[in-house]
Swiss-Prot record, chain A:
One GO MF term: ATP binding
Role description: Allows the formation of correctly charged Gln-tRNA(Gln) through the transamidation of misacylated Glu-tRNA(Gln) in organisms which lack glutaminyl-tRNA synthetase. The reaction takes place in the presence of glutamine and ATP through an activated gamma-phospho-Glu-tRNA(Gln).
Keyword Zinc appears in the UniProt entry: no
Protein name: Glutamyl-tRNA(Gln) amidotransferase subunit A
Gene Ontology terms: cellular component: glutamyl-tRNA(Gln) amidotransferase complex
Quaternary data: Heterotrimer of A, B and C subunits.
Record's catalysed reaction(s): L-glutamyl-tRNA(Gln) + L-glutamine + ATP + H2O = L-glutaminyl-tRNA(Gln) + L-glutamate + ADP + phosphate + H(+)
GO BP: any one term: translation
Nucleotide-binding is among the record's keywords: yes
Alphabetized UniProt keyword annotations: ATP-binding, Ligase, Nucleotide-binding, Protein biosynthesis
Swiss-Prot record, chain B:
Name of the protein described by the UniProt record: Aspartyl/glutamyl-tRNA(Asn/Gln) amidotransferase subunit C
GO molecular function: asparaginyl-tRNA synthase (glutamine-hydrolyzing) activity; ATP binding; glutaminyl-tRNA synthase (glutamine-hydrolyzing) activity
Upper classification of the organism: Bacteria, Pseudomonadati, Thermodesulfobacteriota, Desulfuromonadia, Geobacterales
Chemical reaction(s) catalysed: L-glutamyl-tRNA(Gln) + L-glutamine + ATP + H2O = L-glutaminyl-tRNA(Gln) + L-glutamate + ADP + phosphate + H(+); L-aspartyl-tRNA(Asn) + L-glutamine + ATP + H2O = L-asparaginyl-tRNA(Asn) + L-glutamate + ADP + phosphate + 2 H(+)
The encoding gene: gatC
InterPro entries (alphabetical): Asp/Glu-ADT_sf_sub_c (IPR036113), GatC (IPR003837)
E.C. number: 6.3.5.-
Domain of life: Bacteria
Gene Ontology terms describing biological process: glutaminyl-tRNAGln biosynthesis via transamidation; regulation of translational fidelity; translation
Pfam families in the cross-refs: GatC
């Protein structure tokens, strides 16, 4: 076992026992990045100098007996988190040279605990994508099979866990962008309830859907990292002021007697046979652990993708209006007049997927189409949210696949955006409903690619899904298998 | 057709995006197929349904009207593509 293979809690024990220092752990991680990241491209920016300064500081804290769960732990951040003095690109040319003047709240919380930030991770441009292929900084590869995508948009955050180039990472999830790459890369990814984690200092894509969450090697780490970043923040007026429970303390409670619902609309024809088999085995496992399994119905599931691509693109078109070449970001050189400076700067700075979504969103919000598209989608969102609330009257947790197939090949879906969008069918409804979901490793395809299982909880039911995930992980141990890299 | 090339050009102007001829052609086709897919929402009767703009029910969030710190002029201008003294410099607005 190398230092870079360890989980947060394993490394924490070694740091606490002074078996290893944070500087040693950080050097090991930086060496690992140097050795393998040219194959994976999980990092947009590596920050060795700052990381070693933070590691020395962590070692001083540990020597003084002030060790928190994340003190001295090398972590990576999706490049959507603004970091003071460290370039933050959001995977876009328009922010290629942007150096933020402040830290966002999640980042500040990690720093307060003494976590070591080793770098900024690859992602789809402005978190728009399901394959990490829309990044201006080149596609990220799946460590289990370098010809496959790691999923997206937090592709780098998931690939770094699988490649063991970060002990843990943070990502964001707007329509599945934590859970789907976690599933494709064989790690644990959690999207918390909307409002659980502050979005302050997270570059906005679709503000009513975006949420910050952890990608980790196991469920215990997920609980630890969520606990570290969760909580009310006056700087984000949509963050919710409810107490943050001790997510680790309740992990071992077990699943005996809990009611697990299987939404019948998620177990349909067309599900990849390997995914289907993994789900059947997981259901059997939960039965053997004493859970009460029943079928439930989420009748409006088939409308979720259409609803999402109206709401998310509409919000994106408004959020991305700020990239105008005036205060920060790319400015076109040879524009005549102010209006052309805007439209040329944006044309040069944004890639095709971002342009496509700005166009769709602008159209949906434009005069004459607002009611037909945007308001209609918001009404359907109400129905989808209602489906979940109704299901949670009958069961505690929902069990579903994360994606219809394991990781797909690079370039396979690039020419057909609609096919790419449809691959998010099992994750999008959770964002529309605003509730929480976790992806847990649940087996492998015949080709050796990881398959994830999704557990969906009630709003602020993170404890329940973490507990259910932990019971499964303890029995199956899929998470211990390592990518061949 | 759900959307014409002329409409796509109009939307590009609204969005302040200068698109090439090739991009206009590609987006017209792609937006047409996506909007055709989105049509399926019309199969649902949503008469009387309240639209959801936000997942968590919430009131306006107010804070006390007190001055707090700011990042300062130099930090605010540090990423400016072009500046003049303590201002962002832009091309002439009125010809």
């Amino acid at each position: 076992m190398e230092i870079f293979d360890l989980t947060i809690h394993e490394l924490h024990e070694k740091l606490k026992a002074k078996e290893v220092s944070s500087v040693e752990a950080t050097r090991a991680m930086l060496d690992r990045i140097e050795a393998v990241d040219s194959q994976v491209n999980a990092y947009i920016t590596v920050t060795p100098e700052q990381a070693l300064v933070q590691a020395e500081d962590a070692d001083r804290r540990i020597a003084a007996g002030e060790i928190a769960p994340l003190t001295g732990i090398p972590v990576g951040l999706k490049d959507i988190f603004v970091t003071k003095g460290i370039r933050t690109t959001c995977g876009s040319r328009i922010l290629e040279n942007f150096v933020p003047p402040y830290d966002g709240t999640a980042v500040a919380k990690l720093k307060e605990q003494g976590a070591v930030i080793v770098g900024k991770l690859n992602q789809d441009e402005f978190a728009m994508g399901s394959s990490n292929e829309s990044s201006y900084f080149g596609p990220c590869k799946n460590p289990w099979d370098l010809s496959c995508t790691p999923g997206g948009s937090s592709g780098g955050s998931a690939a770094a866990i699988a490649a063991r180039t970060a002990t843990a990472t943070l990502g964001t999830d707007t329509g599945g962008s934590i859970r789907q790459p976690a599933s494709h890369c064989g790690c644990v990814g959690l999207k918390p309830t909307y409002g659980r984690v502050s979005r302050y200092g997270v570059i906005a894509y679709a503000s009513s859907l975006d949420q910050v969450g952890p990608l980790t090697r196991d469920v215990t780490d997920s609980a630890l990292l969520l606990g570290a970043v969760a909580g009310y923040d006056p700087m984000d007026s949509t963050s919710v002021n409810t107490p943050v429970p001790d997510y680790v303390a309740s992990l071992a409670k077990g699943v005996k007697g809990i009611k697990i619902g299987l939404p019948k609309q998620y177990f349909i024809e067309g599900l990849d046979p390997d995914v289907k088999r993994a789900m059947d085995e997981a259901i059997a496992m939960y039965k053997s652990l004493g859970a009460d399994i029943r079928e439930v119905s989420l009748p409006n599931t088939e409308y979720a993708v259409a609803t999402y691509y109206i709401i998310a693109t509409a919000e994106a078109s408004a959020n991305l209006a700020r990239y105008d070449g005036v205060r920060f970001g790319h400015r076109a050189e040879d524009a005549r007049g102010l209006a052309q400076m805007y439209s040329k700067s944006r044309a040069e700075g944004f890639g095709p997927e971002v342009k496509r979504r700005i166009m769709l969103g602008t159209y949906a919000l434009s005069s004459g189409y607002y009611d037909a598209y945007y308001v209609k989608a918001q009404k359907v969102r109400t129905l989808i949210q209602q489906d979940f609330l109704n299901a949670f009257k009958e069961v505690d947790v929902l069990l579903t696949p994360i994606a219809p197939t394991p990781a797909f090949k690079i370039a396979e879906k690039l020419e057909d955006p609609l096919q790419m969008y449809l691959s998010d069918i099992f994750t999008i409804p959770v964002n529309l409903a605003g509730t929480c979901g976790i992806s847990v490793p649940a087996g492998f395809s015949a080709a050796g690619l990881p398959i994830g299982l999704q557990l969906v909880g009630k709003p602020f039911g993170e404890q329940e899904i973490l507990t259910a995930a932990y019971s499964f992980e303890r029995e199956t141990q899929w998470h211990l298998k390592k990518a061949p890299l | 057709m759900k959307i014409t090339r002329e409409q796509v050009e109009h939307v590009a102007r609204l969005a302040r995006l200068e698109l090439s001829e090739a991009e206009l052609d590609t987006f017209t086709g792609q937006m047409d197929s996506i909007l055709s897919y989105v049509e399926k929402l019309n199969a649902l009767d949503t008469e009387g349904i309240v639209p959801t703009s936000h997942a968590v029910p919430m009131e306006n969030a107010f804070r006390a009207d007190e001055a707090t710190g700011s990042i300062g002029v130099e930090a605010a201008l540090a990423n400016a593509p072009l500046r003049a003294q303590s201002f962002f410099r832009v091309p002439k607005v009125i010809e």
